[in-house]
């Protein structure tokens, strides 16, 4: 038994084996989270943002059809911000997919775990930040996921 070990590890080989198993487990968890995030962003969030942007653009066009003197500043600002968020999400989706593929291609479990931690998690955070910002702008009826306020209210 190694000194200080609470898991009754008998020797260095067993310790390294357990380490590799833990690194593999970590990598698999982050991989699943990243793939889930990619699917949600591609199939739910970006389409919702685009649908809401279309609605806002149609509203602006309708207002301008009535009179060129009607302001569409609010709609323009909303479209600019959502477009920026959608672009950031799209870029993060591409970067995240590349980072996941690169991490999965590494030869050892410890290298994969480090790559998932150092390269995948930061891109997941960036994608999340853009999606969180878009959520605050999109109309409630368009957003496909429960909002933070609804989740807190119903807890």
Predicted regions mapped to residue ranges:
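Short, small-residue-biased leader/transition segments that mark boundaries at the very start
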Residues: 2-8
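A structural signal for alpha-helical segments
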Residues: 33, 40, 70-77, 84, ...
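Charged, amphipathic alpha-helical oligomerization/scaffolding segments
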Residues: 40, 44-51, 55, 81-95, ...
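Leucine-rich amphipathic alpha-helices with coiled-coil/heptad-repeat character
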Residues: 56, 63, 93, 100, ...
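C-terminal structured domains
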Residues: 62-75, 80, 121, 141-155
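Extended, well-ordered alpha-helical scaffold/bundle regions in very large, multi-domain proteins
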Residues: 65-105
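Long amphipathic alpha-helical coiled-coil segments
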Residues: 101-116, 139-154
């Amino acid at each position: 038994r190694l000194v200080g070990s609470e898991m009754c590890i008998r020797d260095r080989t067993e310790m390294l084996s357990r380490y590799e198993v833990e690194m593999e487990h970590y990598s698999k968890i982050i991989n699943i989270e990243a793939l889930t995030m990619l699917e949600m962003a591609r199939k739910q969030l970006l389409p919702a943002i685009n649908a809401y942007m279309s609605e806002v653009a149609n509203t602006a066009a309708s207002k301008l059809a009535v009179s060129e003197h009607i302001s569409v500043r609010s709609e323009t600002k909303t479209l600019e911000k959502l477009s920026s968020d959608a672009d950031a999400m799209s870029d993060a989706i591409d970067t995240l997919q590349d980072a996941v593929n690169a991490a999965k291609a590494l030869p050892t479990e410890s290298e994969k775990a480090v790559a998932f931690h150092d390269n995948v998690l930061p891109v997941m955070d960036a994608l999340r930040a853009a999606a969180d910002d878009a959520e605050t702008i999109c109309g409630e009826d368009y957003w496909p996921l429960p909002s933070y306020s609804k989740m807190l209210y119903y807890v």
